[in-house]
């Protein structure tokens, strides 16, 4: 709780499993409140949440979805960082809104402060759960332990994985006490290896290393340096159309094929 700001945690084996658990918690929360009437989920275009059926259903990229449709129903898509687009999708049947705090595969787009605060306020007003996916952007990558901590908001449910175990397969979804008490109960969800001793030892060590090696401070310092240098490249080369990101999660948008650049970078 001290690190994440959340109250309860359920350990999984991967990020996709964490998303599955988060979606189930949201659906169960709405079911206990309203029965089978309010089960719609709003996700974002160009998002990525995983390749299992539930996670894929809230992934807004046809490249991943097409071969596996029809997917889980009652999912609507809105445009990221466009509050009006989200608002128009909300109805009395909406139970959750899910998005990455920083869209990764979608092009390195951090949520704007206005967008995330407006969505949070809308969720509070309509008793809709806000699910923030921190699987790619969390664990210090943006300069804070979780990217949402840079905004004056808090999710109802958060997903985490990847760097949380530093290479050991582990994921988690975290909830506020309110959601935990009014959603999943014993038998609603399970995992064979989630929370196993090896995984939890790895997580514990990763957390220790964050403090011992001043990782967050280093991300802020090196992130500022990277931002400055990428800005210089953006000015220097016409083929670079945009520079976006925060901390060490940054990217360049180019109007040319970048395969050669990527291969050279890997070699170097």
What are these regions (language model features)?
Residues 1-268:
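Conserved N-terminal phosphate-binding loop of PLP-dependent enzymes in the Aspartate aminotransferase
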